[in-house]
């Protein structure tokens, strides 16, 4: 398996820690997610439909900073959660944020390819939200998700949909950020799952009717426009989002794509 710093990954730890997140070592991230929020409800419903609701289930998130999804799965699914984060300061901040919510769980400062579970038990669910699209070749990353799941366990992979309008906008306003993404479609993601001999596709697709969140457009304009102009833009944008609620999920407008796959319990197809 190639190391993520040896050509396959499109980013480095320095990019995330120093350039992108600009981590404030003294600021503990806010974690709580409203499952009914318009930017999250689509994923909440999907996960409720396809993941087990067992309080003894063990979940591992790869690329877990700032810890919101770990908080979410612990709170709404009752899972025993762990996380892997390869930017060491971000791993520590994630641990602090969860501890502030009385969730004391292991957060491993490690590369996902180097991480080995502390016990012989693998995980019932292995997930990532916005990780695999930062690799030029996603096959080793998807394979690693499957290796960490127990036989019969589930793999959940969600990515921002940069194959549609969000990718076009991001390329226009932040070409340097666009450059560190693999602009894969849902079909590309599903094909990568189907190519893995140890995983069976369960469900997936484009999720969300319309949102420009993956393009970073709103924070980009908020920093550059007079506040009255931005307030007008925000009202127009929010109106578009409400109207778009009636659109079908699609490659062009949906903000995210997601797949659920199951690790095979045997070695043959």
Which functions belong to the PLM regions below?
Residues 123, 198-199:
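Conserved hydrophobic/aromatic "anchor" residues
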Residues 158-180:
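Short, glycine-/aromatic-enriched active-site segment of Class I SAM-dependent methyltransferases
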């Amino acid at each position: 398996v190639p190391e993520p710093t040896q050509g396959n990954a499109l980013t480095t730890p320095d990019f995330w820690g120093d350039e992108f997140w600009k981590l404030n070592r003294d600021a503990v991230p806010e974690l709580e997610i409203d499952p009914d929020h318009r930017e999250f409800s689509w994923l909440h419903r999907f996960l409720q439909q396809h993941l087990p609701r067992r309080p003894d289930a063990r979940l591992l998130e790869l690329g877990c900073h700032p810890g919101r999804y770990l908080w979410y799965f612990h709170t709404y699914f009752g899972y025993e959660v762990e996380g892997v984060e390869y930017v060491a300061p971000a791993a520590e901040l994630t641990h602090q944020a969860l501890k502030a919510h009385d969730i004391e769980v292991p957060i491993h400062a490690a590369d996902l390819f180097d991480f080995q579970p502390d016990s012989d038990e693998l995980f019932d669910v292995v997930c990532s939200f916005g990780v695999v699209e930062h690799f030029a070749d996603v096959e080793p990353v998807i394979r690693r998700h499957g290796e960490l799941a127990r036989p019969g366990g589930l793999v959940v992979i969600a990515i921002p949909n940069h194959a549609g309008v969000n990718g076009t906008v991001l390329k226009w306003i932040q070409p340097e950020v666009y450059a560190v993404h693999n602009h894969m479609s849902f079909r590309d993601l599903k094909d990568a799952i189907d190519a893995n001999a140890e995983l069976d596709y369960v469900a997936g697709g484009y999720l969300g009717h319309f949102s420009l969140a993956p393009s970073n457009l709103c924070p980009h304009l908020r920093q550059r426009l007079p506040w009255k102009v931005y307030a007008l833009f925000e009202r127009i944008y929010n109106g578009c989002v409400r109207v778009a609620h009636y659109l079908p999920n699609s490659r062009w407008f949906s903000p995210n794509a997601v797949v659920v796959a199951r690790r095979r319990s045997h070695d043959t197809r």
